[in-house]
């Protein structure tokens, strides 16, 4: 009878993030959508095709009225930063967005605190860009002929 060939099992180390040298940053894109009702922080790769992590302010607090608060946005941003570090992302380009269209062009309360929390948690910030959709000419805005009277 012939002998069986015994294969040595080799253990390979698998990392989640890309292989980079020390001191080199791996960039992702953080898309922060801050409306008056909630704050979304959505991190993708540079092409925007693959979602790495997506957390909202509503996932962090229980009360509905607190979803858009700066505190909820800060908690969401801290979670995003820890998850990005696990995946090997060390730096982020920021795309900040308000509701836009024929609604408000001003970002909500959570935008600034989310950005600050990302920076304080050790993520390097690349470019900050405002991507709020602004219409060249749009449909009629909500409210009557004379506007909203207070």
Swiss-Prot record:
UniProt key word Lipoprotein: no
GO biological process terms, semicolon-separated: translation
Keyword annotations from UniProtKB, A to Z: Ribonucleoprotein, Ribosomal protein
Gene Ontology molecular functions: structural constituent of ribosome
Similarity section: Belongs to the universal ribosomal protein uS11 family.
Keyword flag Acyltransferase: no
Region (Disordered): 130-150
Top-level division of the source organism's lineage: Eukaryota
Biased composition (Basic residues): 141-150
Pfam families (UniProt xref): Ribosomal_S11 (PF00411)
One GO CC term, this protein: ribosome
The protein, known as: Small ribosomal subunit protein uS11
């Amino acid at each position: 009878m012939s002998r069986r060939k015994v294969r040595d099992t080799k253990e390979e180390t698998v990392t989640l993030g890309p292989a980079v040298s020390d001191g080199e940053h791996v960039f992702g894109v953080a898309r922060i959508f801050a409306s008056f009702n909630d704050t979304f922080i959505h991190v993708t790769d540079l092409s925007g095709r693959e979602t790495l992590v997506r957390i909202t302010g509503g996932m962090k607090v229980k009360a509905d009225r607190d979803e858009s608060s700066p505190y909820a946005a800060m908690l969401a941003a801290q979670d995003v930063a820890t998850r990005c570090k696990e995946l090997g992302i060390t730096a982020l380009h920021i795309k900040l967005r308000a509701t836009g269209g024929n609604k408000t062009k001003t970002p909500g309360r959570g935008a600034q605190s989310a950005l600050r929390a990302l920076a304080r948690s050790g993520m390097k910030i690349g470019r900050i860009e405002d991507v709020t959709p602004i219409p060249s000419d749009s449909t009629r805005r909500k409210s009557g002929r004379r506007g909203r009277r207070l």
